[in-house]
C-alpha cells in the first residue's frame, strides 16, 4: 500500500503496521482490458474486482470501442459493504486482464486507493470516561 508523501512535498514517516480501512478503489486499464482484481498478497483474498465499460456510440464519453468507464469499489456504512481493513505496509496484488486476440501496446493496470485510519472502538473505551464536577 503506497505510503504517499507528507506535507510540502517531503516524506512523512508512517507506521507500516497502522490499520486502515479502504474507502474507494478505482481501477484503470486501456483498450482491450477485460477486468481488474485487487487482492491481499498474503492470503489471496479478493478485495475488489471490476470490469471496464466500453462505449458504443460517437458522442464524447461514449466513443465506440474505447474504455469509457470503470466502476469503482466503494465501502462504508450500510447499505455499502463494510470496508476491508489493511495494514499500511501490507502488500497488495493487482491482476489486470486483457483480451490478447489482437496486438496491443501500452497495456497496463493500476489502482488508485483511498483509505482512512481505523479509529479506536468506542466499545473499547466504554466506561473509561471521567466526569469532572
Which role fits each region the language model picked out?
Residues 1-133:
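Beta-strand-centric surfaces of beta-sandwich/beta-rich domains
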Amino acid at each position: 500500500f503506497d505510503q504517499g508523501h507528507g506535507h510540502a512535498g517531503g516524506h512523512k514517516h508512517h507506521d507500516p503496521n497502522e490499520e486502515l480501512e479502504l474507502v474507494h478503489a478505482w481501477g484503470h486499464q486501456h483498450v482491450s482490458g477485460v477486468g481488474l482484481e485487487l487482492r491481499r498478497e498474503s492470503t489471496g483474498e479478493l478485495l475488489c474486482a471490476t470490469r471496464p465499460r466500453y462505449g458504443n456510440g460517437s458522442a464524447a464519453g461514449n466513443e465506440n470501442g474505447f474504455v469509457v468507464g470503470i466502476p469503482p469499489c466503494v465501502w462504508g456504512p450500510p447499505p455499502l459493504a463494510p470496508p476491508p481493513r489493511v495494514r499500511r505496509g501490507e502488500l497488495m496484488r493487482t491482476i489486470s486482464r486483457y483480451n490478447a486476440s489482437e496486438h496491443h501496446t501500452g497495456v497496463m493496470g493500476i489502482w488508485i486507493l483511498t483509505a482512512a485510519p481505523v479509529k479506536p472502538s468506542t466499545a473499547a473505551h466504554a466506561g473509561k470516561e471521567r466526569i469532572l464536577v
